[in-house]
């Protein structure tokens, strides 16, 4: 996955970049290549905000988290994206499976 990291209203930190890339790497097993992630880190009032947009083969996933700690924000937004990916995968899987067949005639 290709990452694009943007920092608004705060200094760029190598530790935050590495942590975000490590956490977002968990999404790779659910995405088809080529996938891109646009991550924006910002500070609003006293909250650390993380916005993530993930694009893959015509599908777009987006998440936003605001927490007191930047690392907690990253964890929260990754959890949101994982839920979206699971939901999409389950919907596609169930759609392809088709309707369940009846067990047989009832007597």
Describe the predicted segments one by one.
Residues 1-107:
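N-terminal, polar/charged subdomain of small-to-medium soluble alpha/beta proteins
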